[in-house]
Curated annotation (Swiss-Prot):
<feature type="repeat" description="Solcar 1">
    <location>
        <begin position="3"/>
        <end position="86"/>
    </location>
</feature>
<dbReference type="InterPro" id="IPR023395">
    <property type="entry name" value="Mt_carrier_dom_sf"/>
</dbReference>
<protein>
    <recommendedName>
        <fullName>Solute carrier family 25 member 48</fullName>
    </recommendedName>
</protein>
<keyword id="KW-0472">Membrane</keyword>
<dbReference type="Pfam" id="PF00153">
    <property type="entry name" value="Mito_carr"/>
</dbReference>
<keyword id="KW-0813">Transport</keyword>
<dbReference type="GO" id="GO:0005739">
    <property type="term" value="C:mitochondrion"/>
</dbReference>
<keyword id="KW-1133">Transmembrane helix</keyword>
<keyword id="KW-0999">Mitochondrion inner membrane</keyword>
<dbReference type="GO" id="GO:0022857">
    <property type="term" value="F:transmembrane transporter activity"/>
</dbReference>
<feature type="transmembrane region" description="Helical; Name=6">
    <location>
        <begin position="277"/>
        <end position="295"/>
    </location>
</feature>
<feature type="transmembrane region" description="Helical; Name=4">
    <location>
        <begin position="189"/>
        <end position="209"/>
    </location>
</feature>
<feature type="repeat" description="Solcar 3">
    <location>
        <begin position="214"/>
        <end position="301"/>
    </location>
</feature>
<feature type="transmembrane region" description="Helical; Name=5">
    <location>
        <begin position="217"/>
        <end position="237"/>
    </location>
</feature>
<dbReference type="InterPro" id="IPR002067">
    <property type="entry name" value="Mit_carrier"/>
</dbReference>
<feature type="transmembrane region" description="Helical; Name=3">
    <location>
        <begin position="107"/>
        <end position="127"/>
    </location>
</feature>
<dbReference type="InterPro" id="IPR018108">
    <property type="entry name" value="Mitochondrial_sb/sol_carrier"/>
</dbReference>
Amino acid sequence: MGSFQLEDFAAGWIGGAASVIVGHPLDTVKTRLQAGVGYGNTLSCIRVVYRRESMFGFFKGMSFPLASIAVYNSVVFGVFSNTQRFLSQHRCGEPEASPPRTLSDLLLASMVAGVVSVGLGGPVDLIKIRLQMQTQPFRDANLGLKSRAVAPAEQPAYQGPVHCITTIVRNEGLAGLYRGASAMLLRDVPGYCLYFIPYVFLSEWITPEACTGPSPCAVWLAGGMAGAISWGTATPMDVVKSRLQADGVYLNKYKGVLDCISQSYQKEGLKVFFRGITVNAVRGFPMSAAMFLGYELSLQAIRGDHAVTSP
């Protein structure tokens, strides 16, 4: 079979949908902790969101990611798998072969996937965060107002994903959809290296030599551990990205990545860049486990294989 395979894109779409459903509630908590105020620690944030917004508050802004992140993950996994396969085959000079992967192949393929992910995922992440951050504590802090109850007739800045897109384009231009993209690039390029590479090596390490491929249990465990590692280490730049993207809900106070880092450090110290690291790592495990398991099982079904095959 040639190096380019569409099955990877289809399997990535299914895995992406599974990861959104599993991970969005904790993603909401993570975003509120990083870009909002008045939430304290993780458990305090969960209690505040539930008390003020009920269970629906944890799923705020999920419709757009569910429709779009599935496509986003489809592209990321498709690009990674096909790039890695292309590099491995041409390194050995056998385009139709299945040569062993090297660390350099995985590293370069992960970096390519990280760059591509920003072009497609930047607007998706921005809209998700803008919808998640339509909360009273966040608005009061950014407008310098004392905390008060929301008036019944008071409307949020965005009425939904479509209204959010049109409002951003109207007020900030097309470039507004890519606010925080530079921080996202600094997060995702190393982040995907620490996502795909640990997964590949962990799944191979867990799998007995007699097996032709990792079992679903091995995929779930390796995927979850890779997600926890990747999201945990990506937290500092994830904080900067979230703040830059949430900044435009009511006003813009950051001029760019360096200004956001400087202001955040001056006001809240070094610890601010590790805000949400616990929920990031905890959320990263089930979300990535669902992502890789959905990807591998659907790829197995599409190809008619009897063993799961790593990307």
